[in-house]
Amino acid sequence: MNSIVIGSGFGGIAAALRLKAKGHKVTLIEKHPDLGGRARVFKKNGFIYDGGPTVITAPYLINELFELFKKDPKNYIVLTPLKVWYQFIFEDKTKFNYSGDEQEMK
């Protein structure tokens, strides 16, 4: 069976992999030059920008996709825990570090 998945964000890639694991011939369509959807990262004027959420809060879902193909994710990706997830720099040059830990951010 042939399947088309539109969008290569986390959801699109996961859907394409699940279909492929079930024997479908999958075509993945993405309008941007890079995969990742809102999780992609791009550079502009010397700065690096997140296209959207890039913090992985449920790594077990990634592991599940690798298991479909009997692959060990450790052979392909490295997930590194970060103390600070994001640093926001405001116009007045003040900074706010977001870590996901309410006590740490007080």
Tell me what each language-model feature is:
Residues 1-106:
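N-terminal glycine-rich phosphate/pyrophosphate-binding loop and immediately adjacent elements
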